[in-house]
């Protein structure tokens, strides 16, 4: 009986080990494929086709790499570019990623930060003129997320100070004191919008990004 039990346990252990090996092998394969896709396809596309000669990034790029030069440029897109190349540099150490991260940080702070009312502009023209000055919690969180990542990647104090400043603005203007949580959208000077773009005063999506941004900033 003891021998049968031992053989059974040995069989189970061998099966677990085999599954672990296969799992680790699959994980390694998937990881390698993802890294290759990011470094060989995703990041190069944006590096080759999205960088505008004026120092910013095109608001729209077609699938074949053709930029729509007169397309408006969004705060969320540019915050994502900032986060992406900052995270890429922090992960891979490639100096070309650092160059784009720093370029993105400068453009974002100079173009999308509302120096008067606080917060992040939603849309600007290619020449930097504000097209839509509405404030969205969604855009605020991506800005904090991107700037915090840039600080982690470079140690740039301006990025950290700007991220912390946006955090305080969002807590002061965007947080709903009576029921808690964060209101979705506001006017340029932080009055609540009566007509919400998504017909909701608060959304799960915005709150997920608040959690994401605040966690990284912390």
Where are the predicted features?
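Bacterial Sec-dependent N-terminal signal peptides
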Residues: 1-25
């Amino acid at each position: 009986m003891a021998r049968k039990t031992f053989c059974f346990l040995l069989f189970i252990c061998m099966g677990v080990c085999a599954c672990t090996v296969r799992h680790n092998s699959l994980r390694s394969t998937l990881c390698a494929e993802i890294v290759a896709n990011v470094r060989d396809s995703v990041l190069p596309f944006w590096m080759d086709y999205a960088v505008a000669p004026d120092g910013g990034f095109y608001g729209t790029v077609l699938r074949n790499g053709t930029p729509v030069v007169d397309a408006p440029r969004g705060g969320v897109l540019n915050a994502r570019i900032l986060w992406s190349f900052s995270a890429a540099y922090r992960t891979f150490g490639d100096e070309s990623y650092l160059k784009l991260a720093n370029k993105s940080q400068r453009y974002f702070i100079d173009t999308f930060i509302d120096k008067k009312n606080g917060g992040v502009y939603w849309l600007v023209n290619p020449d930097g003129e504000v097209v839509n000055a509405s404030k969205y919690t969604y855009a605020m969180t991506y800005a904090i997320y991107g700037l915090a990542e840039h600080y982690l990647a470079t140690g740039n104090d301006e990025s950290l100070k700007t991220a912390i400043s946006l955090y305080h603005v969002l807590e002061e203007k965007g947080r709903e004191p009576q029921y808690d949580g964060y209101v979705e959208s506001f006017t340029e000077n932080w009055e609540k919008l009566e007509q919400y773009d998504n017909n909701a005063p608060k959304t799960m999506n915005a709150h997920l990004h608040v959690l994401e941004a605040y966690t990284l900033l912390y």
